[in-house]
Amino acid sequence: MRETVHLGCEKCTRRNYHTTKNKKTTTEKLALKKYCKWCKEHTVHKEMKL
């Protein structure tokens, strides 16, 4: 079953994106390089608690 997860910027810790992932097949935390409008640059966004 897919669940919604929030992605937060590592620099400013703001939650800028949300996506879904299958928690049964992907047990580790998701980390993607995305654009943060608060930092005004591309940073790593990691999965955070809701």
Swiss-Prot record:
Which GO-annotated molecular functions does the record name? Answer: structural constituent of ribosome
A single Gene Ontology biological process assigned to it is: translation
Q: Which residues form a coiled coil?
A: none
Gene3D superfamilies membership: Ribosomal protein L33
| Pfam families named among the record's database cross-references | Ribosomal_L33
Question: Any one cellular component term from GO for this entry?
Answer: ribosome
Give the superkingdom in one word: Bacteria
Sorted alphabetically, which keywords does the UniProt record give? Ribonucleoprotein, Ribosomal protein
Which family is this sequence assigned to? Belongs to the bacterial ribosomal protein bL33 family.
Can you say what this protein is called? Answer: Large ribosomal subunit protein bL33
Q: Which organism is it from?
A: Sulfurovum sp. (strain NBC37-1)
